Swiss-Prot record:
It is found in: Plastid, Chloroplast. This is Large ribosomal subunit protein bL33c. One of its GO terms (molecular function) is structural constituent of ribosome. Gene3D superfamilies: Ribosomal protein L33. InterPro entries: Ribosomal_bL33, Ribosomal_bL33_CS, Ribosomal_bL33_sf, Ribosomal_zn-bd. The keyword Plastid applies. Pfam families: Ribosomal_L33. Its main location: plastid. One of its GO terms (cellular component) is chloroplast. It comes from Emiliania huxleyi (Coccolithophore). Keywords: Chloroplast, Plastid, Ribonucleoprotein, Ribosomal protein. GO terms for biological process: translation.
Length: 55
């Protein structure tokens, strides 16, 4: 059975180049109701870029 906690796994995808590189992380659904936007390192562009949460 699936857990019923507040933490869910989310996938972060590069803002400019969809489908090229992704990060996987967790977030607390109760504290962060909107979609995540994090600045992470992109090995494709070799610099820090914005990664957005996808469904």
């Amino acid at each position: 059975m699936a857990k019923k906690g507040a933490r869910v796994q989310v996938t972060l995808e590069h803002k400019c180049e969809q489908g090229v590189y992704r990060y996987h992380t967790t977030k607390n659904r109760r504290n962060t109701t909107d979609r995540l936007e994090l600045k992470k390192y992109s090995p494709v562009t070799k610099q820090h870029e914005i990664f957005k949460e996808i469904k």
